[in-house]
Structure formats: C-alpha cells, structure tokens
C-alpha cells in the first residue's frame, strides 16, 4: 500500500508543473527570436530600447531592471510578452 501511494505521488509530481518558470524572449535588437526560462521565481520580462550611434537598440530578458533617463523600458508578466 505504501509503495502504491509513493508511486502515485511520484507520478503526480512528474505530471504536474509544480515549478512554473516564466519564459521570456532574450534576443538583442533584430536577431532571430530566442527565449529563455527565467530562474529564481522571476515574474517579469522586459524589453529595453534606446538609441545610440548605430540607431535604435533593443535588449530583452527576464526581470524588470531600473534604467537611466532616455531609455525606454516595458515590463510584462506573461510568457513571451516582451517581443
């Protein structure tokens, strides 16, 4: 009986997503879209945009960093929301 209960517990853990991980885009500027799973219970994705001598630059990733004046940042909370 204990073995059956242990087996059911293991199957439940394997079948359920107990550790949900947010997925964010992480490509830079106009590169081919790629994604990454965020670690440490991160709940935000970001898209940061600024202009330099090469034109507009874009950075994407996990989190919601603080930025300096002149840098546009958009933070969001759903999978792949920062494209």
UniProtKB/Swiss-Prot annotation:
Signal peptide bounds: 1-21
Function recorded in the entry: Binds to muscle nicotinic acetylcholine receptor (nAChR) and inhibit acetylcholine from binding to the receptor, thereby impairing neuromuscular transmission. Has a higher toxicity than cobrotoxin-b. In vivo, when tested on rat arthritis models, shows anti-inflammation and immunosuppression effects.
Transmembrane segments: none
Site feature: May be critical for toxicity: 54, 57
Result for mutant: residue 59 to Q: Decrease in the rate of isomerization reaction of disulfide bonds
CDD domains: TFP_snake_toxin
Coiled-coil parts of chain: none
Source taxonomy: Eukaryota, Metazoa, Chordata, Craniata, Vertebrata
Major localization class: secreted
Species of the source: Naja atra (Chinese cobra)
UniProt name for this protein: Cobrotoxin
Disulfide-linked positions: 24-45, 38-62, 64-75, 76-81
Keyword line: Acetylcholine receptor inhibiting toxin, Disulfide bond, Ion channel impairing toxin, Neurotoxin, Pharmaceutical, Postsynaptic neurotoxin, Secreted, Signal, Toxin
